[in-house]
UniProtKB/Swiss-Prot annotation:
Protein's name in the database: NADH-quinone oxidoreductase subunit B
NCBIfam families in alphabetical order: nuoB_fam, PRK06411.1
Polar residues bias locations: 1-11
Keywords from the UniProt entry: 4Fe-4S, Cell inner membrane, Cell membrane, Iron, Iron-sulfur, Membrane, Metal-binding, NAD, Quinone, Translocase, Transport, Ubiquinone
InterPro entries: NADH_UbQ_OxRdtase-like_20kDa, NADH_UQ_OxRdtase_20Kd_su
Cofactor (UniProt): [4Fe-4S] cluster
Domain of life the protein comes from: Bacteria
Main subcellular localisation: membrane
Subcellular location: Cell inner membrane
Amino-acid positions noted as binding [4Fe-4S] cluster in the UniProt annotation, renumbered to this chain: 72-73, 137, 167
Length: 193
């Protein structure tokens, strides 16, 4: 038992991961970031990186989103958690508490009475926090733009990072918006200089 008496080097087996049925390669094998990481790890046995790059990589791989479904767009927001789209494979998962969330997805018509509650939930989220505006009602009021009780875009209440157009937008459009947010997080620095 243990490592005594072994003459071979201890090497972890090649990770198999989830294979893409179309190409037969592991999912994410064409990602330049991971190819550089794997090349450096197999060459040296360790990785040299900046803390900024490591923090950014961790943030993009573990986005927890706050569900703020206000109207029919919320149904499409639920679809990305189902098996067909499986948003968790991209490192995103819904959370019920704003204190555990990184992203707020505003899906639907924001009314004047709901605006203070939206802002309160946004203020309870820890930094860095991001907002995705989903659907034409959240983006600019939609069909109810001229109603006295509708806020003409949630960007009047909270700062919005990604706009997903459509009425309602498809689950693919929301998934694309989340991937754009991950790309935006990778581009921005984490440490203020």
């Amino acid at each position: 038992m243990g490592l005594t008496g072994t003459n071979t080097t201890l090497v972890a087996p090649q990770p198999k991961g989830i294979l893409d049925p179309r190409t037969g390669k592991p999912v994410g094998s064409d990602d330049a970031f991971f190819n550089d990481l794997n090349g450096e790890l197999s060459d040296k046995g360790f990785i040299v990186t900046s803390a900024d790059a490591l923090i950014t990589w961790a943030r993009t791989g573990s986005l927890m989103w706050m569900t703020f479904g206000l109207a029919c767009c919320a149904v499409e927001m639920m679809h990305i958690s189902m098996p067909r789209y499986d948003a968790e494979r991209f490192g995103i998962a819904p959370r019920a508490s704003p204190r555990q969330s990184d992203v707020m997805i505003v899906a639907g018509t924001l009314t004047n009475k709901m605006a203070p509650a939206l802002r309160k939930v946004y203020d309870q989220m820890p930094e860095p926090r991001y907002v995705i505006s989903m659907g034409s009602c959240a983006n600019g009021g939609g069909y109810y733009h001229y109603s006295y009780s509708v806020v003409r875009g949630c960007d009047r209440v909270v700062p919005v990072d990604i706009y997903v157009p459509g009425c309602p937008p498809t689950a693919e459009a929301l998934l694309y918006g989340i991937l754009l947010l991950q790309k935006k997080i990778r581009r921005t620095g984490t440490i203020e200089r």
